[in-house]
Amino acid sequence: MWATRGLAVALALSVLPDSRALRPGDCEVCISYLGRFYQDLKDRDVTFSPATIEEELIKFCREARGKENRLCYYIGATDDAATKIINEVSKPLAHHIPVEKICEKLKKKDSQICELKYDKQIDLSTVDLKKLRVKELKKILDDWGEMCKGCAEKSDYIRKINELMPKYAPKAASARTDL
């Protein structure tokens, strides 16, 4: 009787999907960033050795911002990183292992890596800036690397965004009719 139950449990566990496997939408930052990095290496004809890839990844991460910089921090490719698991990226990439598999292995080492998601992009050509929150308006300026000194009210942020839009989002600025 116990053997039958044990067999039933073993069968049930073998049929259920592995919870560690990546689902669609998992590790989106990891997969896209490492995919771009791998393509950049191929385009520049870089030698695929672990040491070279490690050096190139550190250089590539210096340009990273936002969620991609956080990914670089988690894998140890930034100067202020606490842990260093960069070899978990460089060795598999040297053997041309797909980035999805690399991210799956990184997820097992540090689950935070796959929890990173890109922020939702705001379509500036169609959005009504008056309906956005001040936090979202600040985020737009921050993404552009700008600050609004002296802005106290929502209208100040909207005015600043409208001033800078031709510089940072020229297509959106030309598409807007409320200017």
From Swiss-Prot:
GO CC annotations, alphabetized: extracellular region; sarcoplasmic reticulum lumen
Region feature Interacts with HSPA5, mapped onto this chain: 126-169
Domain of life (superkingdom): Eukaryota
Phenotype caused by lack of the gene: Homozygous knockout mice are embryonically lethal, embryos delivered by cesarean section show reduced alveolar volume and fail to initiate respiration. In an inducible knockout model, young mice with induced muscle injury show reduced density and cross-sectional area of new myofibers formed at 4 days post injury (dpi) and persistent necrotic myofibers within the regenerating tissue.
Sequence segments annotated as region (Interacts with ERN1, EIF2AK3 and ATF6): 93-155
The keyword Phosphoprotein is annotated on this UniProt entry: yes
Disulfide bridges in this chain: 27-114, 30-103, 61-72, 148-151
InterPro entries (UniProt xref): ARMET-like, ARMET_C, ARMET_N, SAP_dom_sf
Tissue expression from the record: Strongly expressed in pancreatic islets and spermatocytes (at protein level). Expressed in chondrocytes in cartilage (at protein level). Expressed in prorepair macrophages in damaged skeletal muscles, expression decreases as animals age (at protein level).
GO terms for MF: growth factor activity; sulfatide binding
Leader sequence residues: 1-21
Job description of the protein: Selectively promotes the survival of dopaminergic neurons of the ventral mid-brain. Modulates GABAergic transmission to the dopaminergic neurons of the substantia nigra. Enhances spontaneous, as well as evoked, GABAergic inhibitory postsynaptic currents in dopaminergic neurons. Inhibits cell proliferation and endoplasmic reticulum (ER) stress-induced cell death. Retained in the ER/sarcoplasmic reticulum (SR) through association with the endoplasmic reticulum chaperone protein HSPA5 under normal conditions.
Name of the protein in question: Mesencephalic astrocyte-derived neurotrophic factor
Organism: Mus musculus (Mouse)
Encoding gene, per UniProt annotation: Manf
